[in-house]
């Protein structure tokens, strides 16, 4: 009998073992769909981004009008741009849900997979930030100015670092040029780290909702989960296309319809919605360096999660107290997101400070404490 090329060819064999004959737990729920959704988001963003880059000019005098030209004169340019801008939002929705799933079901105990995932999140955040600057609208310019300026809080080397990043003494043409170069490069870096992420995942196999070893009950990825993933793609593309067609500017900032003007500051400088929780944490500390450290800690804290796992069970499925705390954390993040979009005035300042404190308290203190308490109650 002739050997099956799918199983013998050096390249196809890798694809087969990753996407076709991969043994998967039989009970993984829809929460396990977000990995593949992130993959399809990345592919969509790279394709639409490539098409946009063909019509974009990375120059301060031309950037804004080149984006306008793409939307007005390029065939389906408006659609490609809307898909790219809103695709970024869906990318972040998927990654936040994916991380939430990992937290809830204890997937972070696959430490290498988790750590590469956090690196992917950081790279994605960097990519989205530099991408937001490219249309060179008011919020693009001032967002870039405010966020890059944070590096000046680093003692001794801060100011030099900022001027080095800017390529001058303010955000200007060199900044835009290098941000475009970085925005072009980073998605391919993300694709590379994704392969590492998957390699580590396939070393151990997927976790499952019960958080128990599932070697005795595995099913092939294809057709079961390949079909389930296609359903997931459909369910994601429906709202994405609806947003891109019917309300493309819903999540954007109206300030970005005005070309960048270094002489006029917008009344409220705020990032895109997916960074608002971190922005709220940054603003809640009335000290520049303290705020920057809190901002960094708000994301880097994810690296500590595996070390703070004190429960004798992996998943939260059978831990009602931890579940309650988890949903408190979700509510807390929603409050932070709302606060980040509000002006810096009473009562938003104090709400933001309480929510920021609670965020770190839940992750660093309450999760391990409640886990230890549950161990006492159960065992």
Curated annotation (Swiss-Prot):
It is found in: Mitochondrion inner membrane. Heme b b566 binds at residues 98, 197. Heme b b562 binds at residues 84, 183. Its main location: mitochondrion. Keywords: Electron transport, Heme, Iron, Membrane, Metal-binding, Mitochondrion, Mitochondrion inner membrane, Respiratory chain, Transmembrane, Transmembrane helix, Transport, Ubiquinone. A ubiquinone binds at residue 202. It comes from the Eukaryota. The chain crosses the membrane at residues 34-54, 78-99, 114-134, 179-199, 227-247, 289-309, 321-341, 348-368. One of its GO terms (biological process) is mitochondrial electron transport, ubiquinol to cytochrome c. SUPFAM superfamilies: a domain/subunit of cytochrome bc1 complex (Ubiquinol-cytochrome c reductase) (SSF81648), Transmembrane di-heme cytochromes (SSF81342). GO terms for cellular component: mitochondrial inner membrane; respiratory chain complex III. Binds 2 heme b groups non-covalently. It is a multi-pass membrane protein. Heme 1 (or BL or b562) is low-potential and absorbs at about 562 nm, and heme 2 (or BH or b566) is high-potential and absorbs at about 566 nm. Component of the ubiquinol-cytochrome c reductase complex (complex III or cytochrome b-c1 complex) that is part of the mitochondrial respiratory chain. The b-c1 complex mediates electron transfer from ubiquinol to cytochrome c. Contributes to the generation of a proton gradient across the mitochondrial membrane that is then used for ATP synthesis. The cytochrome bc1 complex contains 11 subunits: 3 respiratory subunits (MT-CYB, CYC1 and UQCRFS1), 2 core proteins (UQCRC1 and UQCRC2) and 6 low-molecular weight proteins (UQCRH/QCR6, UQCRB/QCR7, UQCRQ/QCR8, UQCR10/QCR9, UQCR11/QCR10 and a cleavage product of UQCRFS1). This cytochrome bc1 complex then forms a dimer. This is Cytochrome b. It comes from Struthio camelus (Common ostrich). The lineage of its organism: Eukaryota, Metazoa, Chordata, Craniata, Vertebrata. The gene is MT-CYB.
């Amino acid at each position: 009998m002739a050997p099956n090329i799918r199983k013998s060819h050096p390249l196809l064999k890798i694809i087969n073992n990753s996407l076709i004959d991969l043994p998967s737990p039989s009970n993984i729920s829809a929460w396990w769909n977000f990995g593949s959704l992130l993959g399809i988001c990345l592919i969509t963003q790279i394709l639409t981004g490539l098409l946009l880059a063909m019509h974009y000019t990375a120059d301060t005098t031309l950037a804004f009008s080149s984006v306008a030209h793409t939307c007005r004169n390029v065939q389906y340019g408006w659609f490609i741009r809307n898909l790219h801008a809103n695709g970024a939002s869906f990318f972040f929705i998927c990654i936040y849900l994916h991380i939430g799933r990992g937290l809830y079901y204890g997937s972070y105990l696959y430490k290498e997979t988790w750590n590469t995932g956090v690196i992917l999140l950081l790279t994605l955040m960097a990519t989205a930030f530099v991408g937001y600057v490219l249309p060179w609208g008011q919020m693009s310019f001032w967002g870039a100015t405010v966020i890059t300026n944070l590096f000046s809080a680093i003692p001794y080397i801060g100011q030099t670092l900022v001027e080095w990043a800017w390529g001058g003494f303010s955000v200007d043409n060199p900044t835009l040029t290098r941000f475009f170069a970085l925005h072009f490069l980073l998605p391919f870096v993300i694709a590379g780290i994704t392969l590492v992420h998957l390699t580590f995942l396939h070393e151990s196999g997927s976790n499952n909702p019960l958080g128990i070893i599932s070697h005795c009950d595995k099913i092939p990825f294809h057709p079961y989960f390949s079909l389930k993933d296609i359903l997931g793609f459909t369910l994601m593309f429906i709202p994405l296309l609806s947003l891109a067609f019917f309300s493309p500017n819903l999540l954007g900032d109206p300030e970005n319809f005005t070309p960048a003007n270094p002489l006029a500051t917008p009344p409220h400088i705020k990032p895109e919605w997916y960074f608002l929780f971190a922005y709220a944490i940054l603003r809640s500390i009335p000290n520049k360096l303290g705020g920057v450290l809190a901002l960094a800690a708000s994301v880097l804290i994810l690296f500590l999660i595996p070390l703070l796992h004190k429960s004798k069970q992996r998943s939260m499925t059978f831990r009602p107290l931890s579940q309650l705390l988890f949903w408190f954390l979700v509510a807390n993040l929603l409050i932070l997101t709302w606060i980040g979009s509000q002006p810096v005035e009473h009562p938003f300042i104090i709400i933001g400070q309480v929510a920021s404190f609670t965020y770190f308290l839940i992750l660093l203190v309450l999760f391990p404490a409640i886990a230890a308490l549950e161990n006492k109650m159960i065992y």
